[in-house]
Regions:
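Catalytic centers of nucleases
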Residues: 33-121
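ATP-dependent helicase/translocase motor core
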Residues: 2-27, 44, 51-52, 61, ...
């Protein structure tokens, strides 16, 4: 077991480490693992620049359904985990969070309940966020044929996020600091550029 980032040396993958820690903290309980992952995705959606401006808030389905009894008759989990309140005032985004093994392949039956329950006029967007990398062509095609289509957010998208996953594991929600060259690096860059210019 890895006790710190330092033990990994260079080339570690903070998202993988974070997901492993969520799994360990859940002690094999699928429900707890799912809830922890949903919290992570809610936090990510409100911080990640690509998505944060889309929503005025992101709620659990249970909390959202309690606020909107006129739209849904039950608060029970029907395949939708989170609901984004669209900041443009145009409805809601249905979000399903799937904490799968990295190598898992998901059949269409694995997403049918989400597709059915989110097929409502007040859901103007649909996101499926998953930690696996393998999706059959049939499932991807099904997502695109839906109205509205389903946006698939993969492990790769999460890993390449501007959210600092190592900081998140420590309880901080922030973006990765932008790197700027040090003085000696700036000097080396100038010399390289100068070398290119003199070669022309």
């Amino acid at each position: 077991m890895i006790n710190s980032m330092a033990e990994l040396g260079g080339g570690y993958f903070p998202l993988d480490i974070l997901l492993n820690s969520l799994e360990e903290a859940s002690a094999g309980t699928e429900r707890d693992k799912g809830t922890r992952f949903e919290t992570l995705i809610r936090d990510w959606l409100i911080k990640e620049p690509t998505y944060r401006d889309l929503f005025s808030e992101v709620l659990t389905y249970k909390d959202w359904s309690k606020q909107h009894p006129e739209l849904v008759s039950s608060c029970r989990d029907i395949g939708i985990d989170l609901v984004g309140v669209n900041s443009d005032g145009n409805g809601y985004t249905a979000i399903q969070c799937k904490f799968y093994d990295k190598e898992a392949t998901v059949p269409k039956s694995g997403v049918d309940s989400f597709l059915a329950s989110s097929n409502k006029p007040f859901f103007t967007r649909r996101f499926l966020v998953a930690t696996n990398e393998n999706w059959t062509d049939n499932v991807k095609e099904e997502f695109q044929q839906q109205t509205p289509p389903v946006t698939l957010i993969t492990r790769e998208t999460l890993a390449n996020s501007t959210v600092d996953w190592a900081a998140y594991q420590r309880g901080e929600l922030k973006e990765v600091a932008k790197r700027t060259p040090r003085d000696y690096q700036k000097e080396a860059i100038k010399k390289v550029i100068s070398g290119f210019e003199s070669a022309d």
